[in-house]
A protein has these predicted regions:
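Tandem CBS (Cystathionine beta-synthase) repeat/Bateman regulatory domains
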Residues: 1-152
């Protein structure tokens, strides 16, 4: 009987040590956001609402980074559609996304830590934040879901 209990205790300790290591790795808030950033849909701010919505549907995404001359000028999300577009009599072919985007959004650098992204999201009420290089060229985006998944 003692051997059985010793074996069980040993197995429990091994499982606990594995779980602790997994949790420590999963909640490394100091990790750079480039470790969980994914690519982004980057479009000209002159793109029609129809094209943006079609791309959202086709690519199963809900966020576009908008540019002017290759530099970030805004962000447009599903939430912008709900709050600013739906219910208005608009010609989606003629309307430009720049009239409905969030101008000059908060941005992050790929080397910024996950904790910094989380702080910006909570303080600003953002669900998505563009990631740019040092010259404000979009290189990705991070969502609150990315952060939550990273935390475990």
């Amino acid at each position: 009987m003692d051997d059985f209990l010793d074996d069980e205790l040993k197995q429990m300790e091994e499982r606990e040590s594995l779980q602790e290591n997994t949790i420590v790795e999963a909640i490394a808030l100091s990790d750079p956001i480039e470790s969980l950033s994914k690519g982004c849909l980057s479009l000209s701010e002159d793109t029609s609402l129809r094209e943006v919505v079609n791309r959202f549907q086709k690519e199963n995404i809900g966020c576009a980074i908008l540019t002017r001359d290759g530099k970030i000028s805004g962000i447009f999300t599903e939430r912008d559609i709900l709050l600013n577009v739906l219910g208005k009599k608009l010609d989606f072919e003629k309307e430009s996304v720049k009239d409905f985007m969030t101008n000059d959004p908060q941005v992050l650098l790929p080397t910024d830590p996950v904790s910094f992204a989380l702080n910006k999201m909570v303080d600003g009420g953002f669900r998505n934040i563009p990631i740019v290089d040092g010259e404000l060229n979009p290189v990705g985006q991070i969502s609150i879901l990315d952060v939550v998944n990273h935390l475990g």
